[in-house]
């Protein structure tokens, strides 16, 4: 509650990650690890719901739009997936760098963007959600929490977060979480200095490269889409949450993929490039899946790039801007805490500053 970060670090579930992964639907598991005060959790969820009144209708997407000036530094966080150790490690670094105060206040120039999938796949989803919303509550104009496909009520029953909520034995918490998730924006259209960036969890919709929608115009709110009501259901409500990219040389357009999780679209290189050109977008930054896009880590290896960044200085190569522009899409790293039984799992993120992309 007072942002004492060390107190939030609990390592038991990380050490038992493999055993837990096969048992995430059992509410009894979560009772062993819950450290939240339910009333504090409900108060924070209520604050978010009250601050965001409208829920999007069918065939609409909910967008945030923002302009960041030359002094802004953006910290863009990929999939946390209940990884409280990773999240606290990230916040601890911000604190140590003087970006985050012990009172939870971010520096005047700092902005934090969560790309979705905060919950599921581990036992600390509620704690991760609580910490992220605490950061938002203390910095409402500086923190953006986007909706991933795992911020979807139907997914919670499949990947563990539903059982975690059941462990509270409080239906009000479950309903507040549902209402909060329904109010999370699916995409952030941001102008960083004079350059346009798209931040989302999944991928651009299949119609986006030919869309008349002026994505970057106007303020926050809804915009109509041409995606059908069943396009991404039941897995997610929007293609911004669920679509993927295929950036191999022979993937030039888009394809439809039907599976157990519903229907989604895979966007190829030509459609991606056309979208970026049409809407004057420098780069798309997303999470969701490992594709053959430029994937950002302290040490990253892809088929196209190998980026070695010193873990001592956390500096990326001086020509990194060129790599960013050469990439079709940037994919942030994904934390799977239940697969990595480590107490020091790092949470990788993109840092965009007035000196370029670092």
Regions found by a protein language model. Give the residues of each.
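Feature recognizes metal-dependent phosphohydrolase scaffolds
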Residues: 1-358
